[in-house]
Amino acid sequence: TLPHLKSSRGMIVAVTSIQAKIGVPQHTGYVASKHALQGFCDSLRLELKGTGVDILTVLPHWITGTDLRKKAVGKDGNELGASSRKHSKDAIPVGDACKAIIKAMAKRQQELIMPPKLKALLWLNLISPRAADAVITKAMSRQHKQ
C-alpha cells in the first residue's frame, strides 16, 4: 500500500519497453500500452515527489530467456507460440537484465534503458524524428527478413 511504501521509502518498478518512447511499425497496440504506462509512471513520479517513494521505469530492448512470446496470446486470443524470428544481437539475457535493474534500484534511478546504446536513438528521435524513423524502419525490415 502507499502508506507502507512511504514509511519504508519504497520504490515502484515498472518494466515497460524502449517502445514506450519510440514508435515501431506493426506493434501499434503494444507501443500504445507502453506509452500509456510510461506516462502514468512519469505523472506518478511527480505526484509522489518528496514522499520518499521513487519510481523506476525500465525500458529494455529484447530480453532473452523469458519465454514471453511462447506464452503470449494474439489478437484472436490464441497462444502465439514460439517465434521463428531471431532476437536482435543486442538482446539481453534475463539474468543480466535483473542485475541491471537491481543496480538501478540501489542507485534509486528514475529510468534504466537497456542496452544503454539505445539512448542515442532516443536523442536522435528528439533531434530528427525522420532520421529516427528511418533507423527504426531499417532495423525492423532486417528483423522481419530473419
Show where each model-derived region lies.
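Amphipathic alpha-helical dimer-interface segment in Rossmann-like NAD(P)H-dependent oxidoreductases
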Residues: 1-10, 45-46
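Active-site loop immediately N-terminal to the catalytic Tyr-X3-Lys motif
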Residues: 22-28
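A transmembrane-helix-recognition feature enriched in membrane-embedded lipid enzymes
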Residues: 108-142
